[in-house]
């Protein structure tokens, strides 16, 4: 099974931190082999065409931006 790459895009705001914590919790609950990284570089964020943060990127694909999903919703996005 391949390692899941999770990126949290955002400047480090409270919602960004919440999304990071929830995404990590969801990945752990699912038993995924994963790497998670916070990305604050605006050039990288804009490269994903994300205009509102926080955003969740899984294996290079933007799954959600501009809101913080629940852990249950994140589990669906990660599985």
Describe the function of each predicted region:
Residues 61-79:
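Non-catalytic, surface beta->alpha helical segment in thiol-disulfide oxidoreductase systems
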Residues 41-44, 73:
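Short acidic active-site motifs
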Residues 49-56:
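Structural micro-motif
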Residues 32-42:
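Thiol-based oxidoreductase modules, predominantly thioredoxin-like and allied folds used
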Residues 25-33:
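Short helix-loop-beta junction
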Residues 1-25:
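Local sequence-structure signature of Cys/Sec-based thiol-disulfide redox active-site neighborhoods
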Residues 18-21, 51, 69:
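Generic recognition of short, well-ordered alpha-helical segments
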